[in-house]
């Protein structure tokens, strides 16, 4: 999917996000430029830096969703973080390099799970052999037997043993042994009674004390009595974990993060300022200056190795109600050359959001109630009324964009969702009258709508 053309990327984003053509166009170009960079000769490739983007617009217009869908579309490592969570170096709080370490951690875990899925078949075969070893012990004595149900006859002849093993294998595969109990050893690392070391303050070095001491701590092996079916699952996961090549996983993760990582810096407007804060307030300009080397390209130490940030794509977003992008320090402004303003959503967009996307809100509620055997239907006038109410409440209270639809839909369908398991009438129609009945009293009362919707 990484070689998608800009028009194809926009088309894919249109399936989930309504409107915001300019923002979609900008991120599509940024993504295609990554593919173009990989086709450039080696001597010039490292010189081409990603064109970072600032998405400007009120809450609930699709800023975060555009970045998240973009990452899923391209299978890129993605991490979202609020810029306001960071503090200047020297203050208590998270340092800016932690977002690179977190992105690396997420990518390693994702690749590890994928590799475990790839070796699942082999792991299941190995787990099956271990189960058969438990069911048919080598020794004829009582110590060798691990079955806690009536024992299978232990045979000494190798040919008879092989024949018996194959019979057991067939029974195991047919599920005839699932209810038997076996004793298995489950290994875990011992945890100290008191946590002496804390990771606080060691993030800067990418050091994790638990990982450093992990091999020194004694293994904590517990013997558990479980049914064969559960033992099969436990042992399969155990074998899959042993089959994963962590060196390859780590190397691939570093490569993915460096070449195709995306970091979404939300609320960047909260750290925009002139750095004239006094007293206990942490300098906003200080956080910006800490962000600068990460965005422009530096090497960040992590427990998986050093990660270079030169080609990570940074997408920042903010409402910029009070501050302006020009309030960011000039050096940081220069690292975000593309700025896109997202438009506020109106009634027409709300109607489309409710019905058009692949994950449309109405489709979600229909699918949820179908699990109870209830068929939910929305008339066009009901959808129109819901959109009108969302616009009205946004204008009279706080404008939270499309998120208002979630609160309205939840309140609208509250009674249906509550009584769905018990109702005899399995087809329910939501029309304009139903919407008026459920919501108009709340909408008319501004105090109620402020707290409920």
Swiss-Prot record:
Keywords: ATP-binding, Chaperone, Cytoplasm, Nucleotide-binding. It is found in: Cytoplasm. It comes from Desulforapulum autotrophicum (strain ATCC 43914 / DSM 3382 / VKM B-1955 / HRM2). ATPase subunit of a proteasome-like degradation complex; this subunit has chaperone activity. The binding of ATP and its subsequent hydrolysis by HslU are essential for unfolding of protein substrates subsequently hydrolyzed by HslV. HslU recognizes the N-terminal part of its protein substrates and unfolds these before they are guided to HslV for hydrolysis. A double ring-shaped homohexamer of HslV is capped on each side by a ring-shaped HslU homohexamer. The assembly of the HslU/HslV complex is dependent on binding of ATP. It comes from the Bacteria. CDD domains: RecA-like_HslU. Its main location: cytoplasm. This is ATP-dependent protease ATPase subunit HslU. InterPro entries: AAA+_ATPase, ATP-dep_Clp_protease_ClpX, ATPase_AAA_core, Clp_ATPase_C, HslU, P-loop_NTPase.
């Amino acid at each position: 999917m990484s070689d998608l053309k800009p028009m194809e990327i926009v088309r894919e984003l249109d399936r989930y996000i309504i409107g915001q053509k300019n923002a979609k166009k900008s991120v599509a170009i940024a993504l295609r430029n990554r593919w173009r960079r990989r086709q450039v000769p080696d001597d010039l490739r490292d010189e081409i830096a990603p064109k970072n983007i600032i998405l400007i617009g009120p809450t609930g217009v699709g800023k975060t969703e555009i970045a998240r869908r973009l990452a899923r579309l391209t299978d890129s490592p993605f991490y979202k973080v609020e810029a306001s969570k960071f503090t200047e170096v020297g203050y208590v709080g998270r340092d800016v390099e932690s977002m690179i370490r977190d992105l690396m951690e997420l990518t390693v875990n994702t690749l590890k799970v994928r590799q475990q899925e790839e070796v699942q078949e082999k792991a299941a075969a190995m787990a099956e052999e271990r189960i058969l070893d438990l069911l048919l012990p080598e020794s004829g004595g009582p110590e060798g037997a691990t079955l806690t149900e009536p024992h299978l006859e232990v045979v000494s002849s190798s040919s008879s043993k092989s024949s018996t093993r194959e019979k057991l294998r067939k029974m195991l595969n047919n599920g005839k042994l699932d209810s038997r109990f076996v004793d298995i050893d489950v290994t875990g690392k011992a945890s100290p009674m008191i946590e002496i070391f804390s990771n606080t303050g060691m993030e800067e070095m990418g050091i994790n004390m638990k990982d450093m001491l992990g091999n020194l701590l004694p293994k904590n092996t517990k013997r558990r009595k479980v049914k064969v079916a559960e033992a099969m699952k436990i042992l399969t996961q155990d074998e899959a974990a042993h089959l994963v090549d962590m060196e390859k996983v780590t190397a691939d993760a570093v490569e993915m993060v460096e070449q195709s990582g995306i970091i979404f810096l939300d609320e960047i407007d909260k750290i925009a300022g002139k750095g004239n804060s006094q007293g206990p307030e942490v300098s906003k300009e200080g956080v910006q200056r800490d962000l600068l080397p990460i965005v422009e390209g530096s090497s960040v130490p992590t427990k998986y190795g050093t990660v270079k940030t030169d080609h990570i794509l940074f997408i920042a977003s903010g409402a910029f109600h009070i501050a302006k992008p020009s309030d960011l320090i000039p050096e940081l402004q220069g690292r975000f050359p593309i700025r896109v303003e997202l438009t506020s959503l109106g009634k027409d967009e709300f109607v489309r959001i409710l019905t058009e996307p692949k994950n449309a809100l109405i489709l979600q509620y229909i699918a949820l109630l179908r699990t109870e055997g209830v068929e939910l239907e929305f008339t066009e006038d009901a959808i129109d009324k819901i959109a009108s109410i969302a616009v009205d409440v946004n204008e009279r209270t706080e404008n939270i964009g499309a998120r208002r639809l979630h609160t309205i839909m939840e309140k609208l369908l509250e009674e249906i969702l509550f009584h769905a398991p018990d109702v005899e009438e399995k087809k329910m129609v939501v029309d304009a009258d139903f919407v008026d009945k459920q919501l108009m009293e709340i909408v008319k009362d501004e105090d109620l709508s402020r707290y409920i919707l």
